[in-house]
Amino acid sequence: MTSLDQIIDDFAFLDEWEDRYRYVIELGKNLPEMPEVSRTSENKVQGCASQVWLVTHATGDAEDPLLTFEGESDAHIVRGLVAIVLAIFSGKRASEITRIDALDIFGKIGLIEHLSSQRANGLRSMIRRIKSEAEGRLPA
């Protein structure tokens, strides 16, 4: 999977929005395919116009576990957005995930203002889902 730093660098290098959209689609194509068995209603992200599934894996410290995520979408651009979301959050501790401002990152790479309202809402739904998963893994 492409690192967040690499994604940010690549976006800075691409001047045209058509090239940036192609890059988002490429990121999605490079995302490991989620097994069909994981594409359940329980893993489906509500609030996305396209179908999006997220699976959370927790390891390590029960008080502040390390979370990794798998993601999938049936739409090319959204699948690329899933890849960026996973680059932002996957492999981090639950406490760190709750503090990350992913929308700010999408703003810095200039992508948020170029998304349709449906895609932006779906992106927010993915972020809320991941943050909710992280908050649910932390002690009350």
Swiss-Prot record:
Q: What is the lineage of its organism?
A: Bacteria, Pseudomonadati, Pseudomonadota, Alphaproteobacteria, Hyphomicrobiales
Q: What is this protein called?
A: Uncharacterized SufE-like protein R01000
Family to which the UniProt record says this protein belongs: Belongs to the SufE family.
Q: Which organism is it from?
A: Rhizobium meliloti (strain 1021)
Domain of life (superkingdom):
Bacteria
